[in-house]
């Protein structure tokens, strides 16, 4: 029963993450670099540090925790900086491919590499049991099926239909950016692996134990994204976006909403893993579960946002079959163990 609860919590977080780009459409008259930076303040600083505080028992502090593990804290943040590159290109992948296909390809690469590389970096190859590896393979198969549906979509739609669904649609450029985003985004889970000691042991509840490490990763990612966004503000002379006070109430609200929805995936991952401690295979596979469910829900949003409008019934059938495979992959390691 606890395993089911854990998986459901992760699923809720995945749904929230996949919904996080919807509020961005409500942001008015701001350039990409301006709204990306402001939503990042919420997604990578405000809410992660609030979450990390839940792991701190009374009489202690986060600074005390990080000071006690300086090497682990630095490594976690460094992988966060690398993940930040993935975060930047992740946004571009959706710009060129749309929410459904862009998230699918980037998260697929991220799911596979994040799950496989983390135990190897930590010197624990034994964590990669046969059931975990099979689960990763099935996940990648599901994402490949969705990628095939995306390719079928690109072949069947006219240029006008492509632009109507995704304004800057560019399949070739989008594929390249999405694969890079996935590779660099896998560093998030590697960072979480190095940050495993960042908690107060038995004084921290299992459901909160990864949250201090999550904050260090997002802090590193914020540094990368903030540097790039401020550079783009300077280059594009878009600093004026921040001075238009008439837009602040609306844009701040939707940036904050996007930020809390985005962070929910890692808050949910931490809570969910707290219920999976009896299953070593699912603990190792939890990253892949989160990414797979992100893909599932991102494609649900893609359908809702009519990104698949005009596609043949065959293309939609391929898409749905890929979603079904991903759902099955989420609990496959537990069945096979």
PLM regions: where:
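Polytopic alpha-helical membrane proteins, predominantly small-molecule transporters/carriers
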Residues: 1-337
């Amino acid at each position: 029963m606890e395993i089911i609860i854990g998986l459901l919590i992760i699923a809720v977080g995945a749904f929230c993450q996949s919904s996080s780009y919807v509020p961005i459409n409500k942001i008015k008259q701001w350039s990409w670099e301006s709204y990306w930076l402001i939503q990042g303040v919420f997604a990578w600083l405000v809410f992660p540090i609030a979450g990390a505080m839940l792991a701190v028992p009374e009489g202690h502090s986060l600074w005390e925790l990080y000071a006690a593990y300086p090497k682990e804290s630095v490594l976690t943040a460094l992988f966060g900086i690398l993940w930040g590159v993935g975060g930047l290109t992740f946004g571009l992948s959706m710009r060129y491919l749309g929410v459904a296909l862009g998230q699918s390809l980037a998260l697929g690469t991220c799911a596979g590499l994040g799950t496989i590389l983390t135990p190897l970096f930590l010197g624990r190859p034994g964590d990669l049991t046969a059931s975990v590896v099979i689960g990763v393979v099935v996940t990648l198969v599901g994402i490949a099926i969705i990628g095939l549906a995306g390719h079928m979509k690109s072949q069947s739609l006219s240029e006008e239909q492509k632009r109507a669904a995704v304004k800057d649609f560019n399949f070739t450029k989008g594929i390249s950016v999405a694969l890079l985003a996935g590779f660099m985004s896998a560093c998030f889970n590697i960072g979480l692996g190095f940050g495993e000691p960042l908690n107060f042991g038995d004084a921290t509840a299992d459901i909160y134990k990864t949250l201090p490490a999550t904050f260090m990763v997002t802090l590193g990612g914020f540094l990368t994204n903030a540097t790039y966004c401020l550079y783009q503000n300077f280059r594009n002379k878009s600093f004026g976006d921040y001075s238009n006070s008439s837009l602040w109430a609306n844009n701040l609200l939707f940036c904050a909403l996007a930020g809390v929805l985005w962070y929910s995936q890692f808050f949910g991952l931490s809570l969910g893993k707290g219920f999976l401690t009896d299953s070593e295979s699912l603990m190792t596979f939890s990253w892949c579960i989160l990414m797979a469910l992100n893909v599932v829900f991102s494609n649900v949003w893609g359908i809702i946002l009519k990104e698949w409008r005009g596609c043949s019934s065959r293309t939609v059938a391929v898409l749905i079959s890929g979603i079904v495979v991903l759902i099955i992959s989420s609990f496959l390691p537990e069945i096979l163990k």
